């Protein structure tokens, strides 16, 4: 039987390099998320979703489209990850090696996505040209974020004060995407159980409901595009530890 052809959603009019010309969504919610990011009136997007839903892939894809398209007002993409090891507190200062190696250690998945979307050579060139910056929260203090996309990934491991600090850096022509999975709070646990209500991401998700210029997007277990077994595994954890936003 012939395989069903994937529907292609074309991006808005503009001169876009062929490397990121068309976005192909794998679920309806991926398409909705992509469209929300593209809304001109939306400056801050909060996205919650379990692992495997494609939230990071979609946000990076759309950001790259707008950075590479002329006349959008976005000159670069900044991708930030909190420096938290699984099951541990913030440990960036104790990592071995130089700064760039430390940053790379916490952003391996980011580099993988960049390579998948635009290729390793193009990604490396954009990093060298300053069109892509990959960093950590610790080095954002005092920085004004303008004419750029900012993606804060794994935001479930960010404190309320840290997330407030980064949001108040938003300046002109800055679009910020804060995304995370509250079921994977490595920093906030009580007796080994995730205490997601202490997370800055949980705080800001509820605090900014109904605020003009802010939009919320939530993926669910059905959006997981990994092996069907992963969905069944996730369901057992959801039944035991339900996330209530």
Residue spans for each PLM region:
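Conserved helicase motor core of SF1/SF2 NTP-dependent helicases
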Residues: 2-36, 40-152, 156-245
């Amino acid at each position: 039987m012939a395989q069903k052809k994937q529907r292609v959603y074309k991006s808005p009019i503009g001169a876009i390099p062929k490397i990121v010309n068309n976005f192909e969504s794998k679920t309806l919610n991926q398409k909705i998320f992509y469209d929300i990011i593209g809304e001109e009136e939306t400056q801050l997007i909060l996205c919650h979703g379990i692992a495997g839903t494609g939230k990071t892939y979609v946000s990076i894809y759309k950001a790259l489209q707008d950075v590479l398209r002329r006349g959008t007002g976005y000159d670069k993409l900044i991708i930030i990850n909190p420096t938290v090891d699984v099951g541990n507190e913030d440990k960036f200062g104790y990592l071995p090696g130089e700064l760039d190696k430390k940053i790379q250690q916490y952003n391996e998945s980011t580099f993988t996505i960049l390579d998948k979307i635009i290729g390793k050579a193009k990604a490396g060139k954009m990093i060298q040209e300053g069109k892509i910056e990959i960093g950590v929260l610790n080095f954002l203090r005092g920085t004004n974020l303008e004419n750029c996309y900012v993606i804060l990934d794994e935001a479930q491991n960010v404190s309320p004060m840290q997330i407030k600090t980064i949001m108040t850096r938003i300046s002109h022509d800055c679009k910020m995407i804060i995304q995370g999975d509250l079921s994977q709070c490595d920093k906030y646990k009580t007796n080994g159980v995730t205490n997601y209500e202490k997370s800055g991401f949980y705080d800001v998700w509820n605090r900014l409901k109904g605020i003009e210029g802010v939009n919320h997007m939530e993926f669910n277990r059905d959006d997981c595009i990994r092996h069907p077994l992963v969905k069944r595994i996730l369901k057992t954890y959801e039944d035991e530890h339900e996330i209530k936003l």
